[in-house]
Amino acid sequence: MPWRAERRQMYDRVVDVPRLVSFHDLTVDEPPHPAVARLRRRLNDIYAGELGEPFTTVGLCCYRDGSDSVAWHGDTIGRSSSEDTMVAIVSLGATRTFALRPRGGGRSLRLPQAHGDLLVMGGSCQRTWEHAVPKTSAPTGPRVSMQFRPRDVR
């Protein structure tokens, strides 16, 4: 897998992103692994009718251990800021918590995501909820998250 370490602007400084990433536009790029192509086909078979379009991109995150994480956020770049969209997330490897909370505050949901689990966020979820993969102090192995999205949704 062609993993990259990234740095991002966070308020007044640039920080290391606490996970490795790899992004692929599957309308242009070859899938990074044959399993990605198979999963995309299967997810499109199941969800493209409801979504009204196919999944065209895959973003991969590698959480190397419990110190790797993603902060609370909503996927609001592109169309998901104003339209109902769908993201299908497949987890591989160690179990990690996927947390959801209503945007603007409220009680959060904590969903353990184990090897092979599929989590689908659809409808207005990206606009009305935030999600995170919090750090954990419990010993944990690596986890890979594959996020399949339609065009112009990040």
Regions found by a protein language model. Name each.
Residues 1-154:
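Non-heme Fe(II) oxygenase metal-center motifs and adjacent flexible, charged/small-residue loops
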